[in-house]
Amino acid sequence: MKQSPILTFRSSAFPVAPGEDADTNPGIYGKALAQWLSTRLGARGLACGEAFAEDFGWCVGVKMGDKGVHLVCSSGETADTWQVFCFTERGFLDRLRRRPDAAETLEQVFDAVKDCLSAAPEVKELVEEE
């Protein structure tokens, strides 16, 4: 698995729906943020799927050509803090067939996510953590 840096920020623009964490671990939110980013990335020409829940946050599948990247959105320690990162997995068959990994695609999707967040006036204190 390859992972991007983590982006953290503050925003009150992504409301938490009642019972949203029933599909994740308790206290883990981010569905509205995942949907918002999916829309913004789609407007930039990226093929994005619907937001779906995992135990660690809300995810969106992003496709560029034949490569796929997962975008993960989750809540932070306070109601208005959020974190976002991207990752890609290279399956056993990809390695066996010596297909190249999706590192370049991961970087391109991460840059697009960062650009979307940077351009949004509702996003404050955006920080990139390694």
Regions found by a protein language model. Name each.
Residues 34, 38-47, 114-125:
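Structural alpha-beta junctions
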Residues 101-130:
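Intrinsically disordered, low-complexity regulatory regions enriched in serine/threonine/proline
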Residues 50-53:
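Short beta-strand
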Residues 9-14, 26, 67, 95, ...:
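Aromatic-enriched hydrophobic runs in primary sequence
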Residues 1-36, 42, 46:
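N-terminal low-complexity, intrinsically disordered segments
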Residues 55-105, 109:
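Amphipathic protein-protein interaction modules
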